[in-house]
Amino acid sequence: MSQGFRGPTGVFPHQTQPCLDPSYEHSKWRYLQPRGSESYLRSFQLQQIEFLKGRLPEAPLIGAQTQSLPPFLPGHWPRFPGPPAQGKQPEIWGFPRSVTLRNQGFHIGPPLPPPHSRGPPWRGAEGLCSHFQELSISQNPEQKVLNRLEELGEGKATTAYALARELRTPKKDINRILYSLERKGKLHRGVGKPPLWSLVPLSQACTQPPRAVNSDKEVPRGEPDLDSEDGDPASDLEGPSELLDMAEIKEKICDYLFNVSKSSALNLAKNIGLAKARDVNAVLIDLERQGDVYREGATPPIWYLTDKKRERLQMKRSTHSGPAATPAAVSEATQSTSFPTCHPPQSGGSSSMATSKRVENGQEPVTKYESRHEARPGPVRLRPHAYHNGPSRAGYVASENGPWATDDIPDNLNSIHTAPGEFRAIMEMPSFYSPTLPRCSPYKKLTECQLKNPVSGLLEYAQFTSQTCDFNLIEQSGPSHEPRFKFQVVINGREFPPAEAGSKKVAKQDAAVKAMAILLREAKAKDSGQPEELSNCPMEEDPEKPAESQPPSSSATSLFSGKSPVTTLLECMHKLGNSCEFRLLSKEGPAHDPKFQYCVAVGAQTFPSVSAPSKKVAKQMAAEEAMKALQEEAANSADDQSGGANTDSLDESVAPNKIRRIGELVRYLNTNPVGGLLEYARSHGFAAEFKLIDQSGPPHEPKFVYQAKVGGRWFPAVCAHSKKQGKQDAADAALRVLIGESEKAEQLGFAEVTPVTGASLRRTMLLLSRSPDAHPKTLPLTGSTFHDQIAMLSHRCFNALTNSFQPSLLGRKILAAIIMKRDPEDMGVVVSLGTGNRCVKGDSLSLKGETVNDCHAEIISRRGFIRFLYSELMKYNHHTAKNSIFELARGGEKLQIKKTVSFHLYISTAPCGDGAHFDKSCSDRAVESTESRHYPVFENPKQGKLRTKVENGEGTIPVESSDIVPTWDGIRLGERLRTMSCSDKILRWNVLGLQGALLTHFLQPVYLKSVTLGYLFSQGHLTRAICCRVTRDGNAFEDGLRYPFIVNHPKVGRVSVYDSKRQSGKTKETSVNWCLADGYDLEILDGTRGTVDGPGKELSRVSKKNIFLQFKKLCSFRARRDLLQLSYGEAKKAARDYDLAKNYFKKSLRDMGYGNWISKPQEEKNFYLCPVPND
């Protein structure tokens, strides 16, 4: 018999004595509770013991709120019913309160105080403070459910849904509790859906044992009262056993593969005692993830041990076979621990003790117990007892009795107090780098580490050499959307060259690559016996030449500088005018582990292929290989050129502080203004952002006001109908201002371009346009072609004029401009420009010439050019003819353009119609050529056909072969309004001249010298469309023309500075027109109405009426009274030579099979103007 007192979870035996009455034990309970911080310390020490035995996943921490001890398995800790309880043990939902356990074998700390000792009254309050973290206000959820069912009464049942609603608990938690109580034999589940739950009658509960969870386990269930306290132990029984089984299977698999070298899953399963392959498949996959095994083949796979796992097993077996690790030493090092089992007195029975088994660190003891009878049939609950806490000073643990003091650790777990012989096997076990094992040289280790990730390889090498390796962030710069990080490797205080990149990960990798390159060269020199000169290299020295054995690194900082390799390659190809393609060569491997093989193709050149587990990584690696190959080619070509200039780097972003090419920023105006602004800000080290200033309008038509901010400077606000469009327009406006300021700074000779605040550039642009001395002799575009200069002049003028206008009014930047050069050496000046891509609707035609029928950019720029010619003719005087662009023609009746003066047309894309009717694959590269000969393409009969524009839309359709005579009333009633395409009109200009019929009364024909395109350029298709299709059959057409008309063949080409890529979506309906005579006043039209954009629908200055008005003024100024009384149509017909040439031109097109030229209704030209007096 044993004398003891009962604790919250069992008996703490001290000496043998008959068991006392439970009431007596209950009266003594409150005196025998552990006090205050002493209880906390002992509980903490028990948690240390559990951690050392491997039952806790983490070491307990003193001073922190530690979790309670895990529920004790019935097979490990004996449980006994405690004294009768009159209350419930408070606990947090689902987590029982931690309790203090004691037994004779694990008594830790000072001896127990006498049972009648009491502390001072102040100790209770301080003890409460020390146990404040253990307070709880919740209740056992199982007890809540039992109480609720008891309230219903015996024989009453309810559903889980009703319980969940009454207890305000999720239904899934209630279901889990109900089924747990059913397994314990406390509840009865009725049939039906949903099942009805009720309490088990008392008589049935006495005879019905709890249901076993797992019959093949030899550990009995705990008592119902403690199960309600600690929760359902089923999960605790299943987890460790399954883990042990998994570990055992893994060990058997590895041992078998170590002996046979390879095997299939089925063969493995049969040789380790299992039946089917599926029993080991999951374990094999887990081992494969851990890097212990690998497989080859697909159906079925053959499994092998990895080299590293085989080395570890070999080392383990050699260690176990050594003299130090003998079985006697191992058995001597561990002690068996037995837990006494005490049962309540049973009639005619004897208490059975659990068989003691050896417990090793990190394993769960599996102990078999004999069956025992329950002491009481009903549930017995523990009750919290009031007691006086210990002194508060015990909460501060003294150093000599600290949580890890060796005296408090049990002897079987205390390695310090253990005899030296017990752990001799462990202490004498050779380490991985023991001198008894061969150790590789630093050079060999570095070579192995270079095959891995640079950061991981460097850390592994530092650990190999017992050194510390740190990655220090030296500097962080750049805007928030594209920061720059500079990292440096420091090994044992030695600093290596830093590396900079756009992300911390890439910067660390680059710094690790540099450090490993230096260490590799030093180790190689040391192994070869050479003096270690490289080890004394200064920190600033950046080893650019890699070692011979160094494999290519995963990131090339000199090439990409933090950018994606794919992005860098595409930018490089774009600058070179080439297009690259990523080709998927093959796809191998299963679906869960594919291998993609990619290569980069640039034209006919193919770069080395690479393989990777994903398409994205494969493309990046292929781009890296292509960039490295391109850089090597560039370096070789630079070496071959003796005395040549330094070639620029492939990646211009390595020098972000240099001035960006304005052509690149102009490209963003036509593609992605947001990206262009961010690129501009990054190149200058500024941060860019877009702010929503205001939002108004109804939900179906909102208006968003956005404003761009770059480097603390706000740019003009814009208004749009969507947030996306608002950001684009704000970026567009900011780019125009910044580009204009950059151009001004370049023209004035500044070395660096900084954002300039202040006045508008309109006056500056006007002065530059009119003052030849203000122009620089050459454009600030090194190596640019003639067509690049034409394009730059056009965009400069457009940007300077529109930098203060809302971009939403300016269309999608389909720009056309006419540039005038006074001599071949002149840089040129823009005399007219226009934007737009719309035609007037049929219901907006005017009988008075008040609408502009065609608002395409090319047509608008030509009408502005006509206005420029009128202004120059009004200024012409034979006394000042030296400064004029005109001179007297042969016969003296008319004027003509001077021989040195030339006009050049720029269009940002191919003209609509036949000039753009080809596949983009036929596009030609920009080549500087002095040859002006044309090579038109005639591949099929449809090429060269006349085409008309689509009303209220974009694109063209071919004209019908039959005669079409559009009528005014037919169009008003809904007949399709036909407008000839821009390619057909440019063809007419190259035959009849740019001046038109009215100016032919005063001028000889004016022809274009060149045509420049920014996009969709094909020399064969463009020349066919704008001039060569009328000479397809020879010179017959040109021979039929009367003097002074000819077939003009202008020089054609495309720009190389930028390429305005295609944008999806329709262009806007607005159109801009300007000529040099207008100063810096822009006019914005609505292309579908043909009038000035706005509610007033004002008359445009490029309309027929206004141009006819200028013609009348010129007639009055030149004393041509015979033309003042004519209508618009009659005045055009009065130019007999022009009218005859036009009719011949139309007839020839019809005879050549190109179709009929469709004109507007004749009624539209029959309007008159009052005579204009000579001012």
Swiss-Prot record:
Q: Where is the region Disordered?
A: 207-239, 315-384, 524-561, 632-652
Gene for this protein?
A: Adar
Q: Which UniProt keywords apply?
A: Antiviral defense, Cytoplasm, DNA-binding, Hydrolase, Immunity, Innate immunity, Isopeptide bond, Metal-binding, Methylation, mRNA processing, Nucleus, Phosphoprotein, Repeat, RNA-binding, RNA-mediated gene silencing, Transcription, Transcription regulation, Ubl conjugation, Zinc
Task: Mention any Pfam family matching this sequence.
Answer: z-alpha
- Cite the location of the cross-link Glycyl lysine isopeptide (Lys-Gly) (interchain with G-Cter in SUMO) from the record: 368
Q: Where is the Z-binding domain?
A: 135-201, 243-307
User: Which GO-annotated molecular functions does the record name?
Assistant: DNA binding; double-stranded RNA adenosine deaminase activity; double-stranded RNA binding; metal ion binding; tRNA-specific adenosine deaminase activity
Name of protein: Double-stranded RNA-specific adenosine deaminase
A cellular-component GO term for this protein: nuclear speck
Glycyl lysine isopeptide (Lys-Gly) (interchain with G-Cter in SUMO2), cross-linked positions: 368, 821
Q: Locate the compositionally biased regions of type Acidic residues.
A: 225-235
| Main location class | cytoplasm
> What is the annotated quaternary arrangement, including any partners?
Homodimer. Homodimerization is essential for its catalytic activity. Isoform 5 can form heterodimers with ADARB1/ADAR2. Isoform 1 interacts with ILF2/NF45 and ILF3/NF90. Binding to ILF3/NF90 up-regulates ILF3-mediated gene expression. Isoform 1 and isoform 5 (via DRBM 3 domain) interact with TNPO1. Isoform 5 (via DRBM domains) interacts with XPO5. Isoform 1 and isoform 5 can interact with EIF2AK2/PKR and UPF1.
Glycyl lysine isopeptide (Lys-Gly) (interchain with G-Cter in SUMO1) crosslink: positions?
A: 368
Where the record annotates domain A to I editase, the positions are 832-1167
Question: What is the scientific name of the source organism?
Answer: Rattus norvegicus (Rat)
Taking every annotated instance into account, which residue ranges of this chain make up the domain DRBM?
453-521, 564-632, 672-740
Changes after translation: Sumoylation reduces RNA-editing activity.
InterPro entries reported for this sequence: A_deamin (IPR002466), ADAR1_DSRM_1 (IPR044456), ADAR1_DSRM_3 (IPR044457), dsRBD_dom (IPR014720), WH-like_DNA-bd_sf (IPR036388), WH_DNA-bd_sf (IPR036390), Z_dom (IPR042371)
Which residues are recorded as modified (Asymmetric dimethylarginine)?
Answer: 30, 42
Record bears the keyword Phosphoprotein: yes
Quoted from the entry, the domain comment is: The first DRADA repeat binds Z-DNA.
Is the keyword rRNA-binding assigned to this protein? no
Can you state which reaction this protein catalyses? Answer: adenosine in double-stranded RNA + H2O + H(+) = inosine in double-stranded RNA + NH4(+)
